[in-house]
A protein has these predicted regions:
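Class I S-adenosyl-L-methionine-dependent methyltransferase catalytic core
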Residues: 1-192
């Protein structure tokens, strides 16, 4: 797995053996293509990566110039991998700020927000119920974590997901990438 673009382009990232299911390079490339079409570039962007795994999504955004990247991951082995991957990406001196929150996503979204985010990427373990993901989204909405018109991307298994957006969000599109589907939605607080 490599950083696709930006100042750390080509850097090989470590993965967590067995504990996580990394987003495929194809899906990651498509995700960032969608984000670029939405935002133009990553300058000034604040991104939140929930269930960070290897940190590839957040670190890709950092490499591309995001101003602030926060990753939330509770697994200790994954945290070490994210820290090691950050050190690799940081050798190229990306301009943005980075912070790893070593806690559960449920705890993170129950605490006061650390920032307001333009982009949130949520990639929970496949055994997470859709209702649990919808609860996290509701807490992002009611907790004040999101900038108006924030873009949310939720990765779920293509096999059994009945994912739907809760109040405060509008579905934009969904795309299948092998075993995964990424659902895109906009934060629309006036609708919730």
């Amino acid at each position: 797995m490599r950083i696709i673009a930006g100042v750390a382009k080509g850097r090989t990232l470590g993965t967590v053996a067995g504990a996580t299911r990394p987003t495929s390079d194809r899906a990651r490339e498509a995700l960032f293509s969608s984000l670029l079409s939405e935002f133009g570039d990553f300058l000034g962007i604040h991104l939140l990566d929930l269930f960070g795994g290897s940190g590839a999504i957040g670190l890709e955004a950092l490499s591309r110039g995001a101003s602030c990247v926060h990753i939330v991951e509770k697994d200790v082995d994954a945290q070490k991998t994210i820290e090691n991957n950050f050190e690799l990406v940081n050798k190229n001196r990306p301009p943005g700020k980075f912070h790893l929150y070593s806690m559960s996503v449920q705890r993170f979204v129950s605490d006061p927000p650390k920032d307001k985010y333009h982009i949130v990427y949520i990639d929970p373990p496949y055994e997470f119920l859709d209702s649990e993901v919808e609860e996290i989204l509701s807490k992002l909405h009611t907790g004040g974590f999101l900038k108006d018109d924030a873009l949310i991307a939720v990765e779920r298994t293509a096999k059994r997901s009945n994912f739907s957006w809760p109040d405060g969000f509008t579905a934009v599109r969904d795309r299948n990438y092998g075993q995964a589907t990424i659902f895109y939605g906009n934060y629309t607080p006036k609708n919730g």
